[in-house]
Curated annotation (Swiss-Prot):
Pfam family, one: FliMN_C
Protein's name according to its UniProt entry: Flagellar motor switch protein FliM
GO molecular function: cytoskeletal motor activity
Species this chain originates from: Bacillus subtilis (strain 168)
Keywords, in A-Z order: Bacterial flagellum, Cell membrane, Chemotaxis, Flagellar rotation, Membrane
Length: 332
């Protein structure tokens, strides 16, 4: 029998059919013993193991994080990109699944053979372009009538992001992505034969209230030389290796540009619940510091410096006077 669970009505109907002779119990047993034949679709031949798909997911999770940081900085707004699915399908099926008119970026990945296609939902592409041109991120889906300037802006946006793809693959292979073609009609692009297996990585992309999908289509021929490295065993070995100097330098560069909150604290005070509930506009709260005491400057939530309040160019400011001993004692 299959793994399906019958309802009570179905069980009653089955017992009734057996008891009345409408169904032969021996015949059911015979069918159960017979070998089941599973239909195999040669057009959907699975050429990547689950282990290899997991490795590709891990690589592109990293790529999604890098893209999030890259585009957030480029467009000066918060963007969230994440992997939603990783599938292997025939190339023809992938082409049928995307819009008739869309944004297609094709790039080589030297030294591997073949090309990778990045399909960007027009809604996402136009929202990005609007942000680059100083807008608030409004999408106008008119991909069939892209001007030469619009084409250049969109292609440059994604060409500049290819460095992140190189970085995402660093633990597996040293690749050099290079944009080679920009197209809007999928029917004009023939990377591989229709039945060739491709891996499709779908990236959910959120820009403010606008959402869409970026698809990466990677033919089997591109990944074939790397298949031995797409395994958990290889990942475990590479994780134990010492980081490469360029990886350390890249990490240091990203840390140096990270932003952390800095707060100049005037002072603190303690109130009873009764006092807190009775606070009104105009009430004064006495702090624990004298007007001549230096301010505590917090980096993150740790005291790091002592400072003096002042003004610079009509804005409030704080001048660093000394290190805060408390922060040094804590080893911060």
């Amino acid at each position: 029998m299959s793994g399906e669970v019958l309802s009570q009505n179905e069980i009653d109907a089955l017992l009734s059919a057996i008891s009345t002779g409408e169904m032969d119990a021996e015949e059911l047993k015979k069918e159960e013993k017979e070998k089941k034949v599973k239909v195999y679709d040669f057009k959907r031949a699975l050429r990547f193991s689950k282990d290899q798909i997991r490795s590709l997911t891990r690589i592109h999770d990293n790529f999604a994080r890098l893209l999030t940081t890259h585009f957030s900085a480029q467009l000066r707004t918060y963007i969230h990109i994440s992997v939603s699915s990783v599938d292997q399908v025939p190339y023809e099926e992938f082409i049928r699944s995307i819009p008739n008119m869309t944004i297609l970026n094709l790039f080589d990945v030297h030294p591997m053979e073949g090309r990778i296609m990045m399909e960007v939902n027009p809604t996402i592409a136009y929202t990005m372009m609007d942000r680059v041109m100083g807008g608030i991120g409004i999408s106008h889906n008119k991909v069939d009538s892209l001007t030469e300037i619009e084409t250049k802006i969109i292609s440059n946006l994604f060409e500049n992001a290819l460095g992140n793809y190189k970085e995402a693959w660093q633990s597996i292979a040293d690749i050099e992505p290079e944009m080679t073609e920009f197209e809007v009609n999928p029917q004009f692009v023939q990377m591989v034969s229709p039945n060739e297996t491709v891996v499709v990585i779908s990236l959910n992309t959120q820009i403010g209230e606008i959402s869409g999908v970026i698809n990466l289509c990677i033919p089997h021929i591109v990944l074939e030389p790397l298949i031995p490295k797409l395994s958990v065993h290889y990942w475990m070995q590479s994780d134990r290796n010492e980081p490469k100097p360029e990886e350390t330098k890249s990490l240091e560069k990203r840390i140096m540009t990270a932003q952390i909150p800095v707060v100049a604290e005037l002072g603190t005070s303690e109130l009873t619940i009764e006092e807190f509930l009775s606070l009104e506009v105009g009430d004064c709260i006495t702090l624990d510091k004298s007007v001549t005491d230096p301010l505590t400057v917090l980096v993150g939530d740790k005291p790091k410096f002592l400072g003096q309040a002042g003004r610079v160019n009509r804005k409030q400011a704080v001048q660093i006077l000394d290190h805060d001993i408390r922060g040094e004692q804590d080893g911060e």
